[in-house]
């Protein structure tokens, strides 16, 4: 599968505002699954999952990776996510759609700050811990993720390989530090 899919089309982003659809993509990046297995993993009814899968397939966010005929001659279709990591280009989206992805950006910024202070023993980022500063960091990190993610769009990765995400975040943080968007 592709390492990164940059979501910059508001119609695609509109499909991904639903947290259940993002959960489906998360499971399908770990390994291919049938709809029955997905429904079981997510605790959804078959019709409910089918509704979400139709939306995801219509925008090519989920792909068929194989079909198998099992011993009872029933065709099993296995699906996978189109990419391992979906990066949201918030600047290319209308605010009414971008706002759904804001909590993810904010949580990323908080995680980066927290991990940085735990591992370095002090604040590695020279910012005030105010809502305004944390929001600015979240916006900066989102922009940098799009920029770094573009280098990974054509890279193929294996299911469940978290190394690529760690590498992307590392490059993003290093880029932020080197551009003085955050201080050491």
Q: What are the functions of these language-model segments?
A:
Residues 30-37:
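Short capping segments at the starts of secondary-structure elements
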Residues 1-6:
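Long, low-complexity, charged/polar intrinsically disordered regions in eukaryotic proteins
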Residues 60-61:
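Glycine-centered, phosphate/nucleic-acid-interacting loop/turn motifs that mediate DNA/RNA or nucleotide
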Residues 22-26:
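Pre-recognition alpha-helix immediately N-terminal to the DNA-recognition helix
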Residues 82-138, 150-158, 162, 182-184:
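Amphipathic alpha-helical dimerization/coiled-coil segments
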Residues 47, 54:
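Key DNA-contact positions within bacterial/archaeal DNA-binding proteins
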Residues 37-43, 56:
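A short acidic, leucine-rich amphipathic alpha-helix
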Residues 7-20, 34, 67-90:
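Short, cationic-aromatic polyanion-contact patches
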